[in-house]
Curated annotation (Swiss-Prot):
A GO molecular-function annotation: nuclease activity
Name assigned to this protein: Putative pre-16S rRNA nuclease
Family to which the UniProt record says this protein belongs: Belongs to the YqgF nuclease family.
Function: Could be a nuclease involved in processing of the 5'-end of pre-16S rRNA.
Keywords of this entry: Cytoplasm, Hydrolase, Nuclease, Ribosome biogenesis
GO terms under cellular component: cytosol
Single GO biological process annotation from the record: rRNA 5'-end processing
SUPFAM superfamilies for the chain: Ribonuclease H-like (SSF53098)
Protein's UniProt keywords contain DNA-binding: no
InterPro entries: RNaseH-like_sf (IPR012337), YqgF (IPR005227), YqgF/RNaseH-like_dom (IPR006641), YqgF/RNaseH-like_dom_sf (IPR037027)
Length: 139
């Protein structure tokens, strides 16, 4: 069963996919979106869903450290509602606190990637961490 992980931002959506057995997550790509123009990358998402035969989604919920909803939680849930309606597949939500911080740390410490290059991969890595955390807790 393939699960797709998404890190939804206001300008990009980081995409990750699980292996067929649901053990590991791998970052796929970053889809550019524009909330103001109502461009949410659903066409590209549909291509990936078909290519990888996705059966469900996991979307990161950006909660605050005190467990209250952060300013982007509503946008993430709205995005999830749209893809649930478009694809008819279940959508789960995963607390994503500190995933972007962890992703930045990994890119700096382990990969020694420059700031400019980090911006190009950070959302993809955050999506991978969101999905891997979900897989670790549920499978």
């Amino acid at each position: 069963m393939r699960i797709m992980g998404l890190d939804v931002g206001s300008k990009t959506v980081g995409v990750a996919i699980s292996d067929p057995l649901g053990f590991t997550a791998q970052g796929l790509e970053i889809i550019k979106i524009d909330e103001e123009k109502a461009e949410f990358g659903f066409t590209r998402l549909e291509e990936l869903v078909k290519q990888y035969q996705v059966e469900q989604f996991v979307i990161g919920l950006p909660k605050n450290m005190n467990n209250t909803n952060g300013p982007r939680v509503d946008a993430s849930i709205t995005y999830g509602n749209h893809i649930e309606h478009l694809f008819g597949l279940p959508v789960h939500y995963q607390d994503e606190r500190l995933t972007t911080v962890e992703a930045k740390r990994m890119l700096i410490e382990q990969a020694d990637i420059s700031r400019g290059k980090r911006k190009k991969v950070i959302d993809k890595l955050a999506a991978q961490l969101i999905l891997q955390n979900y897989l670790n807790r549920n499978f």
